[in-house]
Amino acid sequence: MEIHIPSLVLCISFFIFFKIVSKLKTKTSNRKHLPLPPGPWKLPLIGNLHNLVGALPHHTLRRLSRKFGPMMSLQLGELSAVIISSADAAKEIMKTHDLNFASRPQVAAADIIGYGSTNITFSPYGGHWRQLRKICTLELLSAKRVQSFRPLRERVFVDLCRRFADHGSSAVNFSEEFMSATYTLISRAVLGEEAEQHEGLLPNVKEMPELTAGFDISEVFPSVGLFKVMSRLRKRIVAVHKDTDRILDDVIHQHRAAKSEEHKDLLDVLLQLQEDGLELPLTDENIKSVLVDMLVAGSETSSTVIEWAMAEMLKNPRILEKAQEEVRRVFDKEGTVDESHIHELKYLKSVVKETLRVHPPAPLILPRICGETCEINGYEIPAETKIIVNAWAVNRDPKYWEDSDCFKPERFLDNLVDFRGNHFQYIPFGAGRRMCPGIGFGLANVELPLAMFMYHFDWELDGGMKPQDLDMEEKFGASAKKLKDLFLIPAIKRTLPTK
């Protein structure tokens, strides 16, 4: 029988091609067996954007998760997202697959405000981010550095208490006063004691969280360039950034001109690191991005937590009385609040922990991005999917918390659950590589003033308002502050320290 070599080669080639295609089909077929997480029905073009209209996003997402599950798919215009609403699912993202979800998605507002996303918050995972993280944990926000700011903390918050005392029996806008004091503290710790140089930053620092959380159609339809051109939000972000950049340039120039061997503030530390040289160069743009991070996150987080802690205690007079009794019992002997004894305030610390559970500073943790397609809990998560962890929902999961929507500080008195990223049912600061690096700094700026307020004053709601009538609605933003400012009447009960 005659064999035609060309025909044989053709047959073998066809056979090999057939086997390769079959294997590829098998792999594709196997992959298709893994579904995406379930989610609500999508509309053409806009996807699930209509589901987020109206109520606060973290409320809406929890309601939807009760129907579709703790891992839920949403289509936000052109962007695919998965919403995480349970401790188990959060652990998969923030621990088991943490490295695969270590980067952030690109966000135009963050790119502008964060100098091309070169800050610790939005920088992509890699060498630059690791270097910034190391600088933050070892140089800027270490326990030793936090302790070094103790005299500044005490001075700023005693001054605030004096302003409260000067009001006599009239009401004060507690929300506004505390935000201003917190900014004074953070700006002096970060930029130095010459407060008049950077007072102009405060309006920008207040506005930035709202701008970064604002809805911009160009973010969900990035392929439509016209939306970027038309975006009024984007124009406002650019204007705020330019003003902030101008002020920070002046502050950096003044620091260089008045160079001191003694590192008095965090900018001094950064400039010294820049001069000494690092593995990766630290540019002025990088330094400014870190400064913006510190100013915004430091001021916003502390003021939000204190505002809610005071509101919850005024809403629940029994809790307020219990906190005051403990603080006065511990400090009456000395006649003043001493930070070195804050650790003795078990109940007040429980109030802070419960506030962080019920009102996490960032109810929706900053999004992560899926690096490579992976499987989680039987679902496929495609590469480039945006991952949003609803910390507000996770912290209120009835599987872990009895009466999960109620404010009960007592639950933490004998509870070893903490917020250091080891217990995924309680993640007010996130967890894993992207966990907030400033927990120690933030807590010090919450516990000390709260102890002072409990020690020196009795508090009443303005206008004879009854506790049950206090409005506890939230405001939409990167942090969920109170919708309405908290107006309180402080009545001094313990003498303030002399100057």
Swiss-Prot record:
Coiled coil: none annotated. It is an enzyme of class 1 (oxidoreductase). It comes from the Eukaryota. The keyword Oxidoreductase applies. Its EC number is 1.14.14.62. Its cofactor is heme. It catalyses: ferruginol + reduced [NADPH--hemoprotein reductase] + O2 = salviol + oxidized [NADPH--hemoprotein reductase] + H2O + H(+). Pathway: Secondary metabolite biosynthesis; terpenoid biosynthesis. It is a single-pass membrane protein. One of its GO terms (cellular component) is membrane. Signal peptide: none annotated. InterPro entries: Cyt_P450, Cyt_P450_CS, Cyt_P450_E_grp-I, Cyt_P450_sf. Keywords: Heme, Iron, Membrane, Metal-binding, Monooxygenase, Oxidoreductase, Transmembrane, Transmembrane helix. Its main location: membrane. Heme binds at residue 436. It is found in: Membrane. Expressed in leaf glandular trichomes. The chain crosses the membrane at residues 4-24. Pfam families: p450 (PF00067). One of its GO terms (molecular function) is iron ion binding. The keyword Transmembrane applies. One of its GO terms (biological process) is diterpenoid biosynthetic process. Belongs to the cytochrome P450 family. Monooxygenase involved in the biosynthesis of labdane-related diterpenes natural products. Catalyzes the oxidation of ferruginol to produce salviol. Salviol is an intermediate in the biosynthesis of carnosate, a potent antioxidant. This is Salviol synthase. It comes from Salvia pomifera (Apple sage). The gene is CYP71BE52.
